[in-house]
Amino acid sequence: MRIIVVDNYEKMSKKAAAMIASQVILKPDSVLGLATGDTPIGMYKEIIDIYKNEKMDFSKVRTFNLDEYYGLNRENPQSYYYYMMNNLFNHVNIDENNINIPNGMADNIEIECKEYERKIDKAGGIDLQILGIGVNGHIGFNEPNISFESETHLVNLNEKTIESNSRFFSSKEEVPTKAISMGIKSIIHSKKIILLACGSAKSDAVSKAINGKINPNIPASILQLHRDVVVIIDKEAASKLNLK
C-alpha cells in the first residue's frame, strides 16, 4: 500500500485524475471502476480538462460503477446514473454501450447482481478501481460486518450512511434505505485500487482502515491485503494516521 498525503482537495483530485489518465493512455481499452459522492467530483472535473486538452481518449474505455440506489430510476437527479452522466460521461467520448451502472429499478435483483458480476468477468476484470471511504469505513455501499466474500448484492444501508447521504436529498426520509453494490470480493479482485479521502470527518475511518486490524467491521481494512493500492488523502484525512 502506497500512501500519498497532499495539501488539499484540489491536489488530491489532480493526482487521482493524472493516475487515471496514465492508465487509459497506457491501455486505451482499460476497464475502470468508478465511484460517486462528493469526494470524486473534483477528480472527474480534472479528467474532463485532460480530455479537452486532447490527452485522453475514452472511445475504448469500459466502466463499471460501484453502486446505485435501489428504487431510483435513471432520470432521478439523486441516482448515480444521473450523477455519472452529469459529472463525467456527457463530457467525454465514451461509448454509451461501455457504461455499466447497476439498475436500481431491476425487477429481479438477484439476476441483476449476477449479471453485473458476469459483465465484469467478461470484460476481463477491473484494471483500476476508484474508491471513496465512508465515515464508518464502508467502501461502495458495503456496510460494516459485510462478508469479505460478498459479490454484487442488495445492501440495507445503515443509519450512519443514511444520515451522511441525507445532505444530497431534501430530507433524511427521502434517502433510499437500500442499494445495489459491488461486493468486497468484486472490489478486491481489481488489478489496481485508488482510495480517496478528504477532510477531518474521514480521519478516523482512514486510520482504522490503514493502521487497524483487518476487520469486517471496517470494510476498507481489507485493502491492506491487496497488492496494489494507492491511498491519496489530504492532511486532515491523514491526521490520525501512523505513517511510520
Curated annotation (Swiss-Prot):
Key word Hydrolase present: yes
Pathway(s) this gene product operates in, as recorded in its UniProt entry: Amino-sugar metabolism; N-acetylneuraminate degradation; D-fructose 6-phosphate from N-acetylneuraminate: step 5/5
Pfam families per UniProt: Glucosamine_iso
Active-site residues (renumbered): D67, N136, H138, E143
Molecular function per GO: glucosamine-6-phosphate deaminase activity; identical protein binding
SUPFAM superfamilies: NagB/RpiA/CoA transferase-like (SSF100950)
Enzyme class: hydrolase
This protein's record includes keyword Disulfide bond: no
GO terms for biological process, alphabetical: carbohydrate metabolic process; glucosamine catabolic process; N-acetylglucosamine catabolic process; N-acetylneuraminate catabolic process
GO CC terms, sorted: cytoplasm
PANTHER family assigned to the protein according to its UniProt record, in alphabetical order: GLUCOSAMINE-6-PHOSPHATE ISOMERASE
Function according to Swiss-Prot or TrEMBL: Catalyzes the reversible isomerization-deamination of glucosamine 6-phosphate (GlcN6P) to form fructose 6-phosphate (Fru6P) and ammonium ion.
Family according to the record: Belongs to the glucosamine/galactosamine-6-phosphate isomerase family. NagB subfamily.
Record-given protein name: Glucosamine-6-phosphate deaminase
Gene: nagB
